[in-house]
Amino acid sequence: MKTPFGKTPGQRSRADAGHAGVSANMMKKRTSHKKHRSSVGPSKPVSQPRRNIVGCRIQHGWKEGNGPVTQWKGTVLDQVPVNPSLYLIKYDGFDCVYGLELNKDERVSALEVLPDRVATSRISDAHLADTMIGKAVEHMFETEDGSKDEWRGMVLARAPVMNTWFYITYEKDPVLYMYQLLDDYKEGDLRIMPDSNDSPPAEREPGEVVDSLVGKQVEYAKEDGSKRTGMVIHQVEAKPSVYFIKFDDDFHIYVYDLVKTS
């Protein structure tokens, strides 16, 4: 987790963004934003969690290879049920959600749970918040030269713990981000796209159980012929064909429509 390059996600190639192993210096931030803002295998065995730190503020050191120890502070958003060693974390000053096995990763040192709790805020427009979930959006960011950069993506869900934030992913960079999207919408920087082209959800019989890929191992063949493996860790309720994937060689959380790609 070294200092980020300071590039917008679009400056990362799609090979880096979705299909190649990403080293620690790829932890990134949308610094241009002026606001605060496959084949499926059997399930992987899970280990038991040590303690419940979801909702806590944490800090820890991070050392990779021969590099110096850097200090990181953030909020634990979730503990992954199919792999309780894995936590989803929003680090201060970064817009991506990261997945780390905090108690097992040897690169993590001096993990400390901070006494300060996450402040809860009343959401300003509950109807708008519900309306945008599952919708395609155009999200505007201001670049260093003052011009606007448009990113098309999908609002996936309200983020856990930090209740005024939303999970979102982008077509050009299919990893999990989180922003305070209601603020961006009211300031004209987020536009909800018409959903007339979306296909209607399939009809289900009463009591029908839809198969889920959560907990399954996945394998992805890269362009160079090598393979990367990972686990499906979450199914998006608003778009059941969309899943979160945590690859073994990366700490970003990837977002893929596995029905379209299977």
Swiss-Prot record:
<feature type="cross-link" description="Glycyl lysine isopeptide (Lys-Gly) (interchain with G-Cter in SUMO2)">
    <location>
        <position position="28"/>
    </location>
</feature>
<dbReference type="GO" id="GO:0005829">
    <property type="term" value="C:cytosol"/>
</dbReference>
<dbReference type="GO" id="GO:0000785">
    <property type="term" value="C:chromatin"/>
</dbReference>
<keyword id="KW-0156">Chromatin regulator</keyword>
<feature type="region of interest" description="Histone H3K4me3 and H3R8me2a binding">
    <location>
        <begin position="93"/>
        <end position="98"/>
    </location>
</feature>
<comment type="similarity">
    <text>Belongs to the SPIN/STSY family.</text>
</comment>
<protein>
    <recommendedName>
        <fullName>Spindlin-1</fullName>
    </recommendedName>
</protein>
<dbReference type="GO" id="GO:0005730">
    <property type="term" value="C:nucleolus"/>
</dbReference>
<feature type="region of interest" description="Disordered">
    <location>
        <begin position="1"/>
        <end position="51"/>
    </location>
</feature>
<keyword id="KW-0539">Nucleus</keyword>
<feature type="region of interest" description="Tudor-like domain 3">
    <location>
        <begin position="213"/>
        <end position="262"/>
    </location>
</feature>
<dbReference type="GO" id="GO:0031965">
    <property type="term" value="C:nuclear membrane"/>
</dbReference>
<keyword id="KW-0677">Repeat</keyword>
<feature type="region of interest" description="Histone H3K4me3 and H3R8me2a binding">
    <location>
        <position position="142"/>
    </location>
</feature>
<feature type="modified residue" description="Phosphoserine; by AURKA">
    <location>
        <position position="109"/>
    </location>
</feature>
<feature type="modified residue" description="Phosphoserine">
    <location>
        <position position="199"/>
    </location>
</feature>
<feature type="cross-link" description="Glycyl lysine isopeptide (Lys-Gly) (interchain with G-Cter in SUMO2)">
    <location>
        <position position="7"/>
    </location>
</feature>
<keyword id="KW-0832">Ubl conjugation</keyword>
<dbReference type="GO" id="GO:0005634">
    <property type="term" value="C:nucleus"/>
</dbReference>
<dbReference type="InterPro" id="IPR042567">
    <property type="entry name" value="SPIN/Ssty_sf"/>
</dbReference>
<comment type="function">
    <text>Chromatin reader that specifically recognizes and binds histone H3 both trimethylated at 'Lys-4' and 'Lys-9' (H3K4me3K9me3) and is involved in piRNA-mediated retrotransposon silencing during spermatogenesis.</text>
</comment>
<keyword id="KW-0131">Cell cycle</keyword>
<dbReference type="Pfam" id="PF02513">
    <property type="entry name" value="Spin-Ssty"/>
</dbReference>
<dbReference type="GO" id="GO:0045893">
    <property type="term" value="P:positive regulation of DNA-templated transcription"/>
</dbReference>
<keyword id="KW-0879">Wnt signaling pathway</keyword>
<keyword id="KW-0597">Phosphoprotein</keyword>
<dbReference type="GO" id="GO:0051321">
    <property type="term" value="P:meiotic cell cycle"/>
</dbReference>
<feature type="cross-link" description="Glycyl lysine isopeptide (Lys-Gly) (interchain with G-Cter in SUMO2); alternate">
    <location>
        <position position="44"/>
    </location>
</feature>
<keyword id="KW-1017">Isopeptide bond</keyword>
<dbReference type="GO" id="GO:0005819">
    <property type="term" value="C:spindle"/>
</dbReference>
<keyword id="KW-0007">Acetylation</keyword>
<dbReference type="GO" id="GO:0030177">
    <property type="term" value="P:positive regulation of Wnt signaling pathway"/>
</dbReference>
<keyword id="KW-0217">Developmental protein</keyword>
<comment type="subunit">
    <text>Homodimer; may form higher-order oligomers. Interacts with TCF7L2/TCF4; the interaction is direct. Interacts with HABP4 and SERBP1. Interacts with SPINDOC; SPINDOC stabilizes SPIN1 and enhances its association with bivalent H3K4me3K9me3 mark. Interacts with SPOCD1; promoting recruitment of PIWIL4 and SPOCD1 to transposons.</text>
</comment>
<feature type="modified residue" description="N6-acetyllysine; alternate">
    <location>
        <position position="44"/>
    </location>
</feature>
<feature type="region of interest" description="Tudor-like domain 2">
    <location>
        <begin position="132"/>
        <end position="193"/>
    </location>
</feature>
<feature type="region of interest" description="Tudor-like domain 1">
    <location>
        <begin position="53"/>
        <end position="116"/>
    </location>
</feature>
<dbReference type="GO" id="GO:0016055">
    <property type="term" value="P:Wnt signaling pathway"/>
</dbReference>
<feature type="modified residue" description="Phosphoserine; by AURKA">
    <location>
        <position position="124"/>
    </location>
</feature>
<dbReference type="GO" id="GO:0035064">
    <property type="term" value="F:methylated histone binding"/>
</dbReference>
<dbReference type="GO" id="GO:0006355">
    <property type="term" value="P:regulation of DNA-templated transcription"/>
</dbReference>
<dbReference type="InterPro" id="IPR003671">
    <property type="entry name" value="SPIN/Ssty"/>
</dbReference>
